[in-house]
Amino acid sequence: MSSPSISILLPTYNYARFLPEAIESVLAQDWPDFELLISDDRSTDGSAAILASYAARDSRIRCHLQPVNLGMVANWNWCLGQARGEYVKFLFGDDRLESPRALRSLRDALAQHPSASLAASARSILNAESALVGLWDEFQDAGLHSGPTVIQRCLRETRNLIGEPSVTLFRRRDAARGFDPRYRQLVDLEFWFHLLEQGDFVYLPEPLCSFRRHTAQQSEQHAIAEVGKWELFELFAASRARAAQQGQSWPAHQFLPLYHHLTHHCRQTATPPPAMQSLRQELAAEIPPLHYAAFRARRHLRSLAHGIRRRLSAAPGTAPA
């Protein structure tokens, strides 16, 4: 059996309500050379019957019902281990491909840029009723970008500018390590950094995929439980250490927002992890006090200005600014 050019990996757990929408969006693609590998992690909502029906209709669909519940990250890695394509695209059971050109566009982006190890696009936001409620385009800079530069930008801005797995495409050869199970909330961002340490990043501003926001998401549950509270700082420390090993300097003053958040978390937590206290002390020793004081003053002024604008726009008879 010849290998497909793209492996679409769909890990799912209790998403029977959304699965048909996700699968139909794959079958509607204008790039037909793919396999759709679906791994159901012991769902209890009738997902198995839906998957069996689709697998019987299209030979490109392979479904596997896990004998035991693997958990989110282990299920992602199981899918990676089964992929046969040159390129890999994740699509979660509650998301969908928004454009019939999604596979072709992302694949072409990597094929046209051999130095790139990761491609992503803007994404539309769906609610639980499948209505489009927004657009996320945080990266806002189309084209090819240096991997290390993108890593540093995400850390400086303290957010995932790349997006969720459903909006990305990467080469299977670069992903042999898999997702790091030590991470939960930022497991995808850590993996993007792993790929970007191997190559460049291509960004497409068209919303090729859709990401759904609803309270049943595991990522939403993790956020509510603050599972990932310290993960950004752990990721920063690990990335900075690897950069230093390669002779790259990451001056602490370039990451003042991250240092500010770390300081806040340490002060608000009765017993911060020792590694986080050490990281805060290390960064504090490198940042001139006046530099940090100026940052805090600017932050305070921006907050005041934002509050004034909100009050003015809410005042009766006042047009929003």
Language model: regions and residue ranges:
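N-proximal low-complexity "stem/linker" segments adjacent to membrane-targeting elements
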Residues: 1-27
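Cell-envelope/extracellular polymer assembly enzymes that use nucleotide-activated donors
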Residues: 4-7, 35, 190
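A conserved acidic beta->alpha catalytic loop
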Residues: 40-49, 68, 92
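Conserved nucleotide-sugar donor-binding catalytic segment
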Residues: 81, 121-123, 135, 139-233
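Conserved donor NDP-sugar-binding/catalytic core segment of glycosyltransferases
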Residues: 100-135
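C-terminal subregions of glycosyltransferases and related glycan-biosynthesis enzymes
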Residues: 156-160, 185, 190, 197, ...
